[in-house]
């Protein structure tokens, strides 16, 4: 009889290499926020992948960057602290881009860890196969990797193969979570991330990092409908106008798109009510950051 494998795996990489796309691909639900804006993951989101022979808990860490404010400091601490808690590390890179200073910074950080490190070259659907080996050789000059696997998280190419390879390095162990549990975050947090994702998709470059979303109330009104009330926080009045849009059109579209995904998540009809409020310089206010759900790990 095959032994059951279970373990915790950290997905690390510089911003926008496809970490959240990978997470959502293997879990099969939208757990991690996806956007073309950098630094969209603010918390280590645990996604639980359960198969007959294994259960893998993925930690989607914030993209590595130089912090510019207290929220950025917290994002970096989350990323680094995660490395000490896990059984394997996925270092994900964009195979379509040259090795950047961010990649070098991460590899310097990973050189001395004793945990198995997998180099996962994502977005192979965007490059010619002949370009793959030269890129792999470039990374091998920096450090030795446990395994090197090219994938496309968006298209699903080679993802199952990578999971099979990863499982061989995980310890034998029990299921930590029930079969139907896909995340350890409360539903309110995932709902707030869905709303934030839609805002990122619909707003300009000025807005993304100044956006915070808090679910104020989420109640089941009856067997068929859940009521969700959420507040969108921005840092300036001008940003509030951008999020609301002319005649409220932008906010209405955010609500429409978010409601669709929230209904998929909850398996129920959703009544979604959104407000937009200005909270000046909120990313530098520790208590407010904590209130938003970005809670620092206790020693």
UniProtKB/Swiss-Prot annotation:
Can you name a GO cellular component term?
Answer: cytosol
Q: Which InterPro entries match?
A: G_ERA_dom, GTP-bd, GTPase_Era-like, KH_dom-like_a/b, KH_dom_type_2, KH_sf_prok-type, P-loop_NTPase, Small_GTP-bd
The segments labelled G3 in the record are 60-63
Q: How does it sit in the membrane?
A: Peripheral membrane protein
* Residues that coordinate or bind GTP: 13-20, 60-64, 122-125
SUPFAM superfamilies linked to this entry:
P-loop containing nucleoside triphosphate hydrolases, Prokaryotic type KH domain (KH-domain type II)
Where in the cell is the protein located? Cytoplasm; Cell membrane
Q: Which family does it belong to?
A: Belongs to the TRAFAC class TrmE-Era-EngA-EngB-Septin-like GTPase superfamily. Era GTPase family.
Quaternary state and interactors: Monomer.
Q: Name the chain's protein.
A: GTPase Era
Organism field: Staphylococcus haemolyticus (strain JCSC1435)
Gene name of the encoded protein: era
